[in-house]
Amino acid sequence: DTLSALSGIDKNQLSRANQVDAALLENNLRSGIWSTEVNQQWAWNPLYYQSLAGGALYTLMSREFAPLPRRLENAAARMEKLPALLAQARSELQPARVPAPHAATYAQQNPGVKSIVNDMILAQKDQLSGARRARLEAAAAACNAALDEHQHWIETTLQPAAQADYRVGAEAF
């Protein structure tokens, strides 16, 4: 356990710079533990999944860090995984723990992922040919279908049941 090992270090024996690093590391570890054990965003915050889904595609396509054909191939690989991520979101989110404003925002933002697929990725499909283009088109079609299914779940299951308080509360904080 890293936190236990860190607490065993005599901080007074460290240089000032290493004391600062040790404090940063300890705070980061404690924050991670709190996030996992107490906050549990995956269970109540649908925007956590929105950030994963949208960010996985948007950051890939919005920055020219690699040639476009390579980024399109990577986008196909990510789109192939997106249906499983959305299924996991439906499995992990506990609608009664979701605040209504979060559910409403999610319902409005989820279609944005489709616009990334259609307007940023598929609009560039002519950069690929043959099997690579076919893979991109198939991945986009499956991704769009999964996003439609997910939108239906958001509107019919998540939003009607989202009643939780959006504040963390004194006990958890």
List each model region and its residues:
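N-terminal maturation segment of proteins
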Residues: 1-173
